Amino acid sequence: MSKILEVNNLSKNYQTINGEVIAIDNITFSLDNQEFLCIVGSSGCGKSTLLNILAGIDSKTKGDIKIKDGLKIGYMLQEDALFPWLNILDNACLGLDIAFKKTKENVSFVKDLLIKYGLKDFLDKYPYELSGGMRQRVGWI
């Protein structure tokens, strides 16, 4: 199988007023095409730090990360990040609105995605009116 991700001797340290904190200490793993990886552990063990580094949100202290050309890494947090004062369609459109500008084409594109993923009857609803799984789908779109 072809490796899509290789992480070798990855470490992340933070400086605090109390000294250095080791968030990730020398981890190594790889992921083949069509493999799944679950990252589990106790609170504060470095799961989010690892994901932030892999997604390019944070930097590593040392180590090597090789990502297959063209592959992008993203992740979804357990808690949704939807704005409670916006309906589902407006929440889902927000990223495109900010990155570009609000257009009829963007709204139509997002609406089609929401319908495709089973949210047709919820476009005008607000996040509190949806189940956790439905809110996750909106956040993913």
Regions found by a protein language model. Name each.
Residues 20, 89, 123-126:
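Signature (C-motif/LSGGQ) region and adjacent switch/coupling loops
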Residues 40-42:
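The feature captures the beta-strand-to-loop junction immediately N-terminal to the Walker
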